[in-house]
Amino acid sequence: MMAMQLKDVCKMRESEPGHRAHDPRSFILRDLPWTIEKLKALPHFEFENWAVIALGGTPNVVQVGDMGIDGRIFPVGTKPNAKGGAMFADDWFPIQVKQIDKVGRPDIDAFEAVMEREGEGGRQRGFFVSFGFSSDAERECAAFHKRTGRLIKLITVQEILDEQHVQKM
């Protein structure tokens, strides 16, 4: 879609890598389109980064020992609590990413612990990305919400690819 607009509206031409330096009116398409198969083949940490960035989040700098948080989403309009406070205050949502076909209840249980542990009073909303989720995982998210009022949004990779995840945010 973007390539079509660049060609039709901006009258730019698609170029091969390395050729743009010679023609400033050209563009290079890179990393698109992703497919389920390509994403399954990515190294684990690259997949995590792809998913977090696709949600509009910030990936962790540290990949090992991340305490169950692969990235964070900072809500728009977040302001520091006080002068000299942290840039985004303490208002953020954790993202957990699993590069597996179906996340089960044990993974959701672990993420619930993360949401309860992080920050004063815990996190009110979190996002969990995977290729799929078991019905037990879905039921546990509903039960967790009923018990605590906290919300875990389950987002499949296909929903990200189809850009349907925006409605879940």
PLM region spans:
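Mixed-charge (Asp/Glu-Lys/Arg
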Residues: 1-169
